[in-house]
A protein has these predicted regions:
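Conserved Walker A/P-loop ATP-binding site and its immediately adjacent core
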Residues: 96-98, 110-154, 294-299, 450
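Conserved pre-motif I regulatory segment
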Residues: 29-86
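Signature of the SF2 helicase/ATPase Hel1-core->accessory helical subdomain module
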Residues: 104-105, 121, 128, 225-344
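Walker A/P-loop
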Residues: 82-101
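Conserved helicase/translocase motor-coupling segment
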Residues: 347-458
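N-terminal accessory nucleic-acid engagement/regulatory domains that precede
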Residues: 1-39
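Conserved helicase/translocase P-loop NTPase motor core
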Residues: 62-80, 215-248, 262, 428
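Inter-Walker segment of RecA-like/P-loop motor cores
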Residues: 137-232
Length: 459
């Protein structure tokens, strides 16, 4: 049984990504798009082109048919309902391009766009999409101190030598921040810097004043992490609230599931901050973008504030229903949003792809077994050392001769070591097979369960 249905766009004269819709959402999505097409006089593409101040040719150059539909739903809900849309497209369908289109829409419609995302290195990805939408000259206020926006199309240094000799381990929050900082330093060195965050003192002055310098910035770029200290420092949250009072604000929530989290059974500080903004500034408009928007009930609770769900149930009622109903209830809510034209998800079709060529490497079993045993020997030695260090640390803490120190459980890394080791055993053989197929004129796709970017970055 097919799990997806071919996506039929309302725009017939634009390039298509040949996407599909999950079968359980297909009927609702088709019905919603039909209503939208009828409401717009059968010219969805013309509606979007008009709102983005683009010719039909420019629109078709910038956006695929699927993306035009998503942008049309977002704009229509803002203008006709004062409500939001959840764009839940799979990676590769172009959520970033749709977000950039909404930034352009906001700029041209008298809004102050505020772009939220998960990591500040994604600011440069958004700039790339903004270039494609013809708004590269729009000046962002980068709220994250010390962060730059770079142009990936302008390389200033071809090669970068990595001197790091750190051993990779599963990342915690501090590790992620460190990795982001290292990547930002690499970006700043390797690509042309087009925009920079103001100096920390200047940013602080802007926050305290609660207003943007006149004619200095056109929109904001900010990460969710900027609100993580809002419990003890309300500076940034108050700044955003002040902007919402002074301007017509359009929030573009990229990686929107990151705006809704739970910590120790309670909504995270970031979630509380986002919810406070949405509750106290009902005049603001929003667009949510996330491929995993329904992975947790808390995400849906944040989104419901700006959709038809807000009229159907109170927050507490919906919260109880989602927790009791589990996944089936979340799917039902998703289908309700899709039917209302307030959620859309498109995915890549797997049709037409060649049968994967699996390389089991059985002929190398003895060699790989020997290599695996060598790695495991050293890992066991590290476990012994870790156990010894943990004992020493515990004694030191007992006698108050060491500051609080938490040892990372070495055994917890076994899964990741095994994962990397298996990849390394296969890499050479797979690469050789890929080269051979390329020489035969074939296009090669190497499927991986994980890019392991953290490791590759240091290789």
């Amino acid at each position: 049984m097919k799990k997806s249905t071919k996506y039929e766009s309302t725009v017939k004269d634009a390039k298509t990504l040949e996407s599909v819709i999950p079968k359980q959402l297909a009927e609702y999505t088709t019905r919603a798009l039909s209503k939208l097409n009828e409401a717009l006089g059968g010219d969805v593409g013309g509606y979007v082109a008009n709102r983005l101040h683009m010719s039909h040719e420019e629109l078709r150059e910038a956006l695929a048919a699927e993306q035009i539909d998503g942008v049309a739903l977002a704009i229509y809900n803002i203008e006709k309902r004062g409500q939001s849309v959840v764009i839940g497209d799979q990676t590769g369908i172009g959520k970033g391009r749709q977000a950039a289109a909404m930034i352009r829409y906001g700029l041209l419609s008298g809004y102050l766009p505020i772009f939220f995302t998960d990591r500040y290195t994604l600011f440069s990805d958004m700039y790339r999409d903004c270039k494609a939408l013809g708004i590269k000259e729009a000046r962002p206020l980068v709220v994250n101190a010390g962060v730059s926006v770079v142009d990936f199309d302008h390389v200033v240094e071809q090669e970068t030598t990595c001197t790091s000799d750190e051993i990779w381990s599963p990342a915690d929050e501090e590790d992620n921040e460190k990795y982001e900082a290292e990547r930002m330093a690499l970006y700043q060195k390797q690509y042309e810097v087009v925009y920079k965050a103001p100096k920390k003192s200047v940013l602080q002055e802007i926050f305290i004043k609660g207003e943007l310098p006149q004619d200095a910035f056109d929109y904001l770029m900010i990460t969710y992490s900027q609100l993580k200290d809002a419990k003890r420092d309300m500076t940034r949250l108050n700044f955003l609230m002040a902007l919402c009072e002074q301007h017509r604000v359009l929030f573009i929530f990229d990686e929107a599931h990151k705006s809704s989290g739970v910590n120790a059974g309670k909504a995270s500080v970031i979630t509380q901050g986002i919810n406070m903004i949405l509750e106290e500034t009902p005049q603001t408009q929003c667009v949510f973008l996330s491929a995993t928007f329904a992975k947790r009930p808390e995400c849906l609770l944040t989104f419901m504030r700006r959709t038809t769900l807000s009229a159907l149930a109170t927050e507490n009622t919906l919260k109880d229903a989602l927790h009791c109903g589990g996944v089936p209830m979340q799917e039902y809510v998703s289908s309700c949003l899709a039917a209302e034209g307030q959620m859309i998800r498109r995915e890549h079709s797997g049709e037409g792809l060649p049968t994967p060529v699996y390389t089991y490497l059985d002929e190398d079993l003895d060699v790989h077994g020997e290599q695996f045993d060598k790695v495991m020997f050293f890992f066991r030695e590290i476990v012994k050392l870790s156990t010894m260090v943990r004992t020493m640390v515990n004694h030191a803490l007992m006698y108050n001769v060491l500051l609080p120190f938490k040892c990372y459980p070495t055994r917890a890394q076994l899964f990741y070591i095994n994962k990397v080791l298996l990849l390394s055993l296969k890499a050479k053989k797979v690469a050789q097979a890929a080269i051979e197929n390329v020489r035969q004129g074939r296009s090669v796709v190497i499927g991986m369960s994980d890019t392991l970017e953290c490791i590759v970055q240091d290789v």
